[in-house]
């Protein structure tokens, strides 16, 4: 019995000593080997996910959350197809429950109600590879789970009588501004590493009476182990969706025509590899919305698992 106890204690002590004294990376590499082999064998399928933290949520130049946000995401890629989901969750109640896109003449009852901004973005893409870059054709669904759906009630002449509101149920796929989902068709071109230019064309095709159009172009420079990105984007024609609108003197027309550079920015970003599959990204952005005459500087960090 004593011999057995001695053997048990000795074996346990030796085992614990090996665990403590052996470098962590040796165990990490051994653990990752099966995963690495699996990824190599199924190289056509990739799964990426992570979470970001930002001092502000800017989307195409628009300050939507008006607060720091958590931004989880997930991406699944199979051959040329890609499915991705993004969430945006404000850390405190800063956004009006009434949609930002409609400015009421008497907003007292609605702007008094504040919520933490939330948004769910779902993308389906198809990538077309070329020698000079990649074309990506996609459809995007924008859903705001906690904001009222605001829409216009018009008379027979087309004049607006009043604004109405309803709860944004996920199964509400109505159009004409009355649904809980806005669908966008987009086409993006991304150049090669030697010429990292990108061009974006996007148009709302469902649940946006204005069928808002957005154009964007940008370029990436390498600077001292950082990426320097410069871009500019804006709307073609007035659009409530991009908060670029003003009332017309004609009662049958709610929007005047016009164009606006709503998203001009410069960003510094850098990726730090903690492990081959674990990446930490840092970004500092300076963005100007010339229509709102607003300048915003934000800092964000994203933890990526790939």
Each PLM stretch: what is its role?
Residues 30-32, 266-268, 293-306:
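Outer-membrane beta-barrel "beta-signal"
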Residues 73-75, 123-125, 184-188, 216-220, ...:
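Outer-membrane beta-barrel architecture
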Residues 53-59, 78-80, 87-93, 128, ...:
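Transmembrane beta-strands of outer-membrane beta-barrel pores
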Residues 227-287, 297-300:
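Outer membrane beta-barrel transmembrane domains
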Residues 41-49, 68-70, 79-81, 120, ...:
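Outer-envelope beta-barrel architecture signal
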Residues 1-46:
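Cleavable N-terminal export/targeting peptides
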Residues 93-216, 245-259:
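Outer-membrane pore/translocation modules
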């Amino acid at each position: 019995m004593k011999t057995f106890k001695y053997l048990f204690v000795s074996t346990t002590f030796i085992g614990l000593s090996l665990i403590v004294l052996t470098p962590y990376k040796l165990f990490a590499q051994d653990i990752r080997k099966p995963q690495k082999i699996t990824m190599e064998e199924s190289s056509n399928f990739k799964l990426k996910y992570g979470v970001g933290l930002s001092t502000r949520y800017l989307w195409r130049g628009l300050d939507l959350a008006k607060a720091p946000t958590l931004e989880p995401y997930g991406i699944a890629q199979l051959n040329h197809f890609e499915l991705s989901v993004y969430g945006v969750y404000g850390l405190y109640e800063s956004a009006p429950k009434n949609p930002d896109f409609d400015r009421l003449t008497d907003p007292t009852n609605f702007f008094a109600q504040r919520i933490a901004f939330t948004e769910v973005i779902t993308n389906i893409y198809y990538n077309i590879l070329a020698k000079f870059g990649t074309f990506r054709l996609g459809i995007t669904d924008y859903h705001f789970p906690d904001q009222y759906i605001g829409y216009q009630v018009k008379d027979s002449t087309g004049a607006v009588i009043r604004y109405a509101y309803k709860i944004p149920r996920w199964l509400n796929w109505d159009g004409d501004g009355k649904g809980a989902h806005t669908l966008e068709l987009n086409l993006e071109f991304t150049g090669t590493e030697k010429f990292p230019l990108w061009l974006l064309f996007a148009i709302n095709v469902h649940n946006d009476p204005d069928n808002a159009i957005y154009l964007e172009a940008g370029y990436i420079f390498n600077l001292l182990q950082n990426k320097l990105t410069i871009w500019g984007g804006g709307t073609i024609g007035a659009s409530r969706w991009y908060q670029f609108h003003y009332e017309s003197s004609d009662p049958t027309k709610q929007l005047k025509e016009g164009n606006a550079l709503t998203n001009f920015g410069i960003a510094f970003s850098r990726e730090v590899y903690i492990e081959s599959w674990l990446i930490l990204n840092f970004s500092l952005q300076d963005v100007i919305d010339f229509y709102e005459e607003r300048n915003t500087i934000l800092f964000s960090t994203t933890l990526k698992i790939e």
